[in-house]
């Protein structure tokens, strides 16, 4: 696997601050090459239209960490998406401005360049369309993109980076969204023990190997592929938050067949992203496995994997322990900064 490096190809962009072209102005803003294993899925089409560049990623990261995106300048994207938690957090539900409680558990940000859906309900199909959601949501940043631009458009550091990325200093909503997406596209996690085993650089312990075999038999119908998600939307009978108007995927489709269905989460770095469930119903992974074993909530649209098996996934205590051993091999300490 190659380390992240720069493709030293110059991109010519011209200054257009006053609608004139400075033909002597050249910007070296090379695309960055990401350390993507050959066995990973294909990059999505949005990535290919907005490939991360040296300064695009730097600009996106600056936006990502800027508290001016919230109405009272108290939180940034990184307030909820913390690197130490695989860019999730340890809260049951996201905490927004004025300590408002969000609808759902904060999703991790990793390997987004390969996904087809974003948000737990799949409401966004392009990553570039996602950043506006937390900006305008009452329980999150409760601001507007117009207000954000007004706050930061005269910042000298932003002006410098905008010129390096786009050729002029003009700040627009589209440029904000594209830059944040470039930064998030660059967050590739592929350096776990599992990856080292996959590439012949390490071996599973006996317990990890046993856990992998149990996982293949009892978990991989949903958590499959190298991202350990099939990106489907399923109702798996988790406890329902009676204090919210949650409907899962049905909020997007308006169809009862999607009621309380959520996107199957990737299990990469799952060790770091507790609590679990759409609103943090489970404090740890063991409690998730116990719940699946004891039996989930039945409903008309309960996923057939449960519906056809007594509404549960039977697991012995030994199987649960081995599964926990295996899932820890999906942890990438370098990704979370350890």
Residue ranges, per PLM feature:
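Periplasmic c-type cytochrome electron-transfer domains
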Residues: 17-338
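Bacterial Sec-dependent N-terminal signal peptides
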Residues: 1-24
């Amino acid at each position: 696997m190659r380390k992240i490096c720069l493709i030293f190809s110059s991109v010519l962009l011209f200054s257009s601050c006053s609608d004139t072209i400075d033909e002597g102005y050249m910007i070296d803003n090379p695309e960055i090459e990401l350390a993507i294993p050959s066995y990973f899925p294909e990059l999505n089409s949005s990535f290919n239209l907005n490939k991360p560049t040296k300064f695009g990623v730097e600009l996106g990261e600056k936006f990502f960490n800027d508290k001016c995106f919230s109405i009272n300048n108290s939180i940034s994207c990184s307030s909820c998406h913390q690197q130490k938690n695989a860019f999730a957090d340890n809260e049951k539900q996201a905490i927004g401005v004025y300590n408002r409680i969000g609808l759902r558990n904060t999703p991790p940000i990793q390997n987004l360049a390969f996904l087809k859906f974003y948000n737990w309900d799949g409401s966004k199909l392009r990553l570039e369309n996602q950043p506006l959601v937390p900006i305008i949501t009452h329980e999150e940043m409760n601001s507007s993109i117009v207000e954000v631009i007004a706050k930061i458009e005269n910042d000298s550091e932003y002006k410098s980076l905008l010129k390096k990325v786009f050729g002029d200093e003009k700040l627009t909503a589209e440029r904000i969204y594209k830059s944040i997406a470039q930064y998030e596209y660059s967050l590739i996690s592929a350096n776990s023990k599992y990856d080292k085993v996959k590439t012949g650089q390490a071996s599973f312990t006996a317990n990890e190997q046993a856990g992998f075999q149990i996982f293949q038999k009892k978990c991989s119908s949903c958590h499959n592929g190298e991202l350990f998600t099939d990106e489907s939307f399923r109702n798996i009978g988790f406890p329902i938050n009676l204090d919210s108007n949650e409907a899962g995927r049905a909020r997007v489709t308006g169809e009862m067949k999607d009621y309380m269905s959520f996107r199957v989460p990737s299990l990469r770095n799952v060790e770091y992203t507790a609590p679990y469930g759409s609103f943090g119903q489970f404090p740890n992974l063991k409690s998730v496995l116990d719940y699946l074993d004891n039996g989930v909530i039945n409903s008309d649209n309960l996923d057939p994997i449960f519906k056809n098996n007594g509404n549960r996934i039977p697991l012995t205590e030994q199987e649960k322990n081995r599964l926990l051993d295996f899932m820890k091999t999906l942890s990438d300490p370098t990704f979370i900064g350890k």
